[in-house]
Amino acid sequence: MTRMALVVDDSMLIRHTVCRFLEERGYAVESATNGVDALERLKEIHPDILITDMMMPKMDGSQLITELKKHPSTARIPIILLAGRQSAVGRPPECRADATIWKDIDIVTQLEKALQKALGAEV
């Protein structure tokens, strides 16, 4: 069975990098550019994993996670948070995400580890 991922990031480069990484590992991938768009996509798809940026226009990653946790149909989706070091300054750690990836460190290596942690499976 093919796993489905939803990648949410306003940076085209990051979105492309993460989507390509997942597609190369057999995932079906959908993407959105912000939290509002992601919530719309989630009306149509049911991903096995959601990977979201922390800082985005319209609705940021923290707000998106809050919305996801409110609804039984999305509350159990494993979440990997993409964050720049600057987005963490002055904010508590995002304890509602299953893993965090720092954008300024090797994303591919971190993605492999985060997927293993969030899904408990080999990548």
Describe these PLM feature segments:
Residues M12-E30:
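Two-component/phosphorelay signaling modules centered on CheY-like receiver
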Residues S31-I49, Q110:
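Acidic, metal-coordinating helix/loop segments flanking the phosphotransfer/catalytic sites
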Residues H46-D48, S73-P78:
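His-Asp phosphorelay/catalytic-motif detector in bacterial-type signaling
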Residues D53:
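Active-site residues of response regulator receiver
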Residues M56:
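Receiver (REC) domain active-site loop signature in two-component systems and cognate sites
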Residues I80-L82:
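Hydrophobic/aromatic residues positioned on beta-strands within the core alpha/beta folds
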Residues D104-L119:
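C-terminal output helix
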